[in-house]
């Protein structure tokens, strides 16, 4: 592969979370044939770009390169699925129960993929000699993955029941409000895990100093906004300010904490696709 295709692939992949969210937000795109086409094109483009950048090392690279490539691919999974399935989906309160079944199934698979990607990243960092920050990050990752798994499974079951019976039982509505705190915990731990992994990547020079600071700062700011929002009503209809203009509410949307892991996945794929003689900072 030449340098130019890999560079273009990296730039495109870095823009994928914004593209995926941009296409998912407008409900007007949820037209049969339209959202299928857009989602299919985005999915193929993401897979092709990831392959060019370094995902091909999963098949043909050395063991260390395979580990990095697989970790990167897993971290790219959430917004790859969002781009494929969520075009025109809109927020949960605007969609039908069958659409929300698909929404939470995607989120469930995404949370499992991110947890798996971070576990592989921890092994790669340990092999590179960084064990302190990566171990702390792994602990946060496992706790976040467990919290996500419980919350996503409950919400998936909630909408499966709603589809089957026409509406969810009142008892499940009450539980859904209680379970919201579990989502906040999952999001918070994901932000903290991502920040700590970024610091670990910086220590082994897989991230530049400036990039490391940006990753850490963004995740800590998101954590702070989420904590402040958790102290107020989580109901988007209870505020005069639109939900998308409230940083704390946005930080607590289940898919948002997966943005920075996605970008770390791009970094890992780039490193996996580099020639063996390349040992410098990659991002």
What is each stretch, according to the model?
Residues 1-283:
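Hydrophobic, aromatic-enriched alpha-helical segments typical of multi-pass transmembrane helices
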């Amino acid at each position: 592969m030449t340098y130019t295709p890999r560079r273009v692939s990296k730039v495109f992949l870095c823009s994928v979370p914004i593209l995926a969210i941009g296409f998912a937000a407008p409900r007007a795109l949820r037209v049969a044939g339209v959202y299928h086409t857009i989602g299919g094109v985005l999915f193929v483009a993401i897979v092709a770009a990831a392959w060019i950048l370094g995902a091909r090392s999963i098949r043909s690279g050395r063991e260390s390169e395979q580990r990095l490539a697989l970790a990167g691919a897993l971290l790219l999974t959430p917004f790859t699925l969002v781009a494929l399935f969520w075009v025109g989906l809109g927020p949960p309160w605007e969609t039908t129960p069958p659409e929300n079944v698909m929404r939470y199934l995607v989120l469930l698979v995404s949370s499992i993929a991110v947890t798996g990607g971070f576990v592989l990243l921890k092994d790669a960092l340990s092999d590179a000699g960084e064990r302190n920050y990566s171990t702390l990050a792994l602990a946060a990752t496992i706790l976040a993955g467990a919290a996500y798994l419980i919350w996503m499974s409950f919400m998936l079951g909630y909408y499966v029941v709603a589809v089957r019976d026409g509406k969810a039982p009142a008892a499940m509505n009450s539980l859904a409000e209680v379970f919201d705190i579990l989502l906040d915990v999952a999001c918070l731990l994901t932000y903290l895990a991502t920040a700590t992994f970024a610091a670990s990547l910086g220590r082994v020079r897989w991230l530049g100093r400036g990039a490391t600071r940006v990753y850490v700062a963004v995740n800590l700011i998101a954590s702070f906004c989420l904590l402040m929002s958790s102290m107020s009503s989580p109901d988007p209809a209870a505020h005069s300010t639109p939900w998308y203009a409230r940083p704390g509410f946005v930080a607590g949307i289940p898919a948002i904490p997966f943005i920075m892991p996605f970008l770390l996945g791009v970094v890992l794929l780039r490193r996996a696709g580099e020639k063996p003689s390349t040992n410098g900072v990659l991002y």
